[in-house]
């Protein structure tokens, strides 16, 4: 088993203020001590050690499941503690030794079974351009991996961030909290 860690001070990006829970005022109104850091930003932190240990192949064909156990507040020191156990890489995002989020990463996509679409109302199609807001997401959030800017690659945290964008635009009105995501990489995405 291989164990390592990486740390960063958590922060929200300006665009996160679209969800009031990511502002001091909104976080306090919801009963927290301040602004909750976006789950996709915490996921960005969790991917840093995965990329360090598994490299670009994980971005090309890997997958992960991320679960948010309790909030990370802006400016808290997040330590990402990693344990490699053969087929998966487990990363805990801890604040003062308390696990706030957990990510299990896989080098390949696990068999996801039959992914059928539920019946119901379809959302409108939307075209999203990855330049500007999304192209340097990881760097702006605090992930210091240089491969994204050097190779012009989209950070893996952009995928759940885009899913959140769809949720915010179509399904919720007011504050909400991201609790879990499954992310499957199909290929590198370059800008």
Question: Model features per residue range: what roles?
Answer:
Residues 1-35, 112-176:
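Catalytic strand-loop segment that frames the active site of acyl-thioester-processing enzymes
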Residues 8, 15-18, 44, 50, ...:
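Generic hydrophobic/packing signal
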Residues 41-88, 101, 162-191:
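Hydrophobic beta-strand-centered segment that forms part of the acyl-chain substrate-binding groove
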Residues 1-10, 59, 63, 70-136, ...:
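HotDog/MaoC-like acyl-thioester-processing domains
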């Amino acid at each position: 088993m291989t164990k390592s860690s990486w740390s960063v001070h958590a922060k929200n990006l300006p665009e996160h203020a679209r969800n009031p829970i990511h502002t001091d005022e909104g976080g306090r109104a919801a009963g927290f001590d301040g602004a909750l850091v976006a789950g996709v930003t915490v996921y960005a932190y969790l991917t840093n050690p995965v990329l360090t240990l598994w490299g670009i192949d994980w971005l090309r064909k890997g997958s992960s499941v991320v679960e948010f156990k309790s909030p990370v507040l802006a400016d808290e020191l997040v330590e990402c503690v990693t344990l490699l156990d053969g087929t998966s890489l487990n990363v805990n995002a801890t604040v003062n030794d308390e696990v706030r989020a957990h990510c299990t990463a896989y080098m390949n996509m696990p068999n996801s079974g039959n992914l059928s679409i539920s019946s119901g109302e379809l959302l409108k199609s939307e075209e999203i351009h990855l330049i500007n807001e999304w192209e340097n997401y990881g760097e702006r959030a605090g992930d210091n991996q240089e491969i994204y800017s050097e190779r012009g690659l989209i950070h893996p945290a952009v995928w759940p961030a885009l899913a959140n964008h769809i949720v915010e635009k179509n399904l919720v009105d007011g504050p909400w909290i991201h609790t879990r995501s499954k992310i499957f990489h199909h290929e590198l995405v370059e800008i």
